[in-house]
Amino acid sequence: MFRLSSVSSKLLLSVAISIIVAIALIIAIVSFQVASYSEKEAKNAISLSSKRYVNYIQGILNEEVTLTKAVATSLNGMFQNNDHVDINLIESLIKNAFDSSHYAVYTFLYLKDTTVLSDMQNVDKKYISPDGKTFSMIFFDQITEKSGGITTISTPNNFSQLNLIQNIEQNVKYGDKDSVFVDSPRKLNYDNNEFLGINFGMPIFNNKGKFIGVIGYTIDLLKISEIILDPKFDFFEGNTRILMNDQGIIAVHENKNGILKTLFDINKDQSAQLIVEAVKN
């Protein structure tokens, strides 16, 4: 879990790109053939390849951090200026912003305190878990490439236990409206469809500065892995491209058995430690 803080959207975005790209998501090429290349040419080729992938991931991070920040700011503004907010207004804001995203496949608003909402009598039943204990608006985008295709997902009983939500609730500071939380890659399942994803989120507060919920966005790593692992981008025979975090936990790897394992689990060579240190730095 990473938390990014700033005093402005511009600075936040800068921090997100520099820290998350460097620490959470970075390309590591761990083997290559240099039979017909000089060492310098090989390093240049690898550098260019890495930059291409970093730029691609940077664009995704740019969008998700900006989107999370913008919607959280709007929601916090609504709750700060009103004791009760129309649930239809909130739904419209979240759906419209979500539809503009090219990468997020899910968005959600979790509220532990629903007294800030008006007209709860007519609320969509999908927003309330079967046991009646959890309120969340969860939306799925079936076609991220174009507008439309947004559907509502029924809130599961255990949704409040989502790792991102738990981490934000446990670590958020009173009235902190600037921190964006980025979860580690993990298996997620909102509607009986398990996938590997990453969550972005921010805390939501009422007009007294009390934490009342989380707005979040989820990206599916499948599309990212298809781009990163596309064989047409191979520079050398036997090269390996990996997406991992600063603990060496692998999110993308051509060997599916290596997913969510550490680099040390699949590579006992001393070079693995050097790669993880490079990611941290």
Predicted regions and their residues:
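Juxtamembrane membrane-water interface segments immediately C-terminal to a transmembrane helix
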Residues: F32-K69, N76, H84
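Extreme N-terminal signal-anchor transmembrane helix of membrane signaling/transducer proteins, especially
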Residues: F2-K40, N44
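Extracytoplasmic/periplasmic ligand-binding sensor domains
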Residues: L117-D141, G148-S154, V182-D183, E194-N199, ...
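Solvent-exposed, extracytoplasmic
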Residues: N88-S100, V214, T218-E277
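Acidic surface patches and DE-rich sequence motifs
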Residues: L111, S129, N189-Y190, N206, ...
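Short loop/turn microsegments at loop-to-beta-strand junctions
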Residues: V105, N199-F200, E237-T240
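Extracytoplasmic/periplasmic sensory segments of membrane signal-transduction proteins
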Residues: E63-K177, I228-K232
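Extracytoplasmic/periplasmic ligand-binding sensor regions of membrane-associated signaling proteins
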Residues: D141-E226
